[in-house]
Amino acid sequence: YDDETELYVPLAISESAELFKKDKEAQYISENNYDFLEESGVINYYKNNDIFLRPSMVSSCSYDIMFASLNAETPLRYDMNYRNYMLVTNGKVIIRLFAPKATKYLYSVNDYENFEFISPVNPWSVQDKYQKDFDKLRSIDVTLVPGQMVNIPAYWWYSIKFVKSNTSVCVFKYKTYMSALSISNHLIMRMLQRQNTKRVIAKRMVSGEANNAKEETETQNT
């Protein structure tokens, strides 16, 4: 985990698919794809078919779809939502779970800008410096194939491994008014963090402009 770098980079779906095919090191994951769901109209299928998943007194619904390179693994993390459903629609995944009491051994990092709670520990290949603490933990592995779904309780740590090519996972997350109230301190921290974060966007240059700038620089130096 590196808070000096961006966790997410926006890419077109065609570019992402090509990236997954070429990736031989299992390091690319695509998530936070709500814009894609909305622009493609797929979001309507989520909303029209999740009635039996929604809890009563729901205050917010979050939908996503995940893709990844073969054998890629998501960071170890936990969610604070009231319900967190993962539905495999293609391929196969293994989800490794840890109970909330494991938090003190997982070196939790609170990223309020992205509202993520991540551990630097890799549960699939534990780093040497974390091995001693990790040996104290017990995990549960859940394997999902197309048509199968799991509900990951709030505060349970999980990491998803994509063990087949072209795997896709539909994600449904819900907050109720009471669950939102119970995590209000974290929601306030997210609001403050976003207000205090300043982003500077660099000017985008096409290749012609870049060459001209290089020629001007060389002329000035001579």
Regions found by a protein language model. Name each.
Residues 1-149, 157-222:
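N-terminal accessory scaffold of Fe(II)-dependent oxygenases
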